[in-house]
Amino acid sequence: MMRLRSDPDVTIDEITSVVETDPALAAQVMSWASSSYYASQSKIRSVEDAIVRVLGVDLVINLALSLSLGKSLSLPKDNPQSSTPYWQQSIYTAAVIEGLTRAMPRELRPEVGMTYLGGLLHNFGYLLLAYVFPPHFSLICRHLEVNPHVSHSLIEQHLLGISREQMGAWLMRFWGMPEELAIAVRFQHDPAYIGTDAHYPNLVCVALGLLQNRGIGHGACAPLPDALFERLGVSRDKAEAVVSKVLEAEVLLREMAAQFGQA
């Protein structure tokens, strides 16, 4: 999937054959395509059908890649109380980022598929944190519960000397993922970031902030400066409208997140 993701000449047949070699993944793709969230007008009869008529190449690769990477690290059993479930937040964030990206002026707009994948994988460092530091992870969860006004990055730096964003960015690079993804993961909570490929972390930052304002997510919510919206070419009102539209499909998005959790 990583090779296909980086191949500009990838064909439908190549993607179909890779998906079909994994029965669980093939069933998942069929399930996504048949979901009422994508509103297919007719029955989906094959993986190729799902890709060509409903989901498209980019979305299938990104969803399958996220699912495959997610399988490599299991969800932690311990979580901060009142936190949004991992895949639920990932799906919401990706959906909002997709809407924000499409709302950007064409001359500023980054690759939609890449920004969507950045949303799906933005919190992957959380899984890595739980996997690498299991004894410390529970301690981090307890600190987050009693200090909801403090950024998780500060707590993690205090207890471990490293944050989930740093770990997640390292893992993206270690796995040979596109550099845009590593940057999106590393700088997702920095509204002032204007470095290389800034649109990717800026989009994650806006999506996370707006969702937190609607009660989705966990922890301290830093204000989103006007300059951040200006760099993306999207007004604050338009961005809020994107979030509202995504949340109209909340039930369907939760179903999709549940499928990720069961895979």
Task: Specify the residue positions occupied by each region the protein language model found.
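Terminal helices and disordered tails flanking the catalytic cores of nucleotide-processing hydrolases
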Residues: 226-263
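Conserved alpha-helical "signature site"
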Residues: 1-141, 148-224
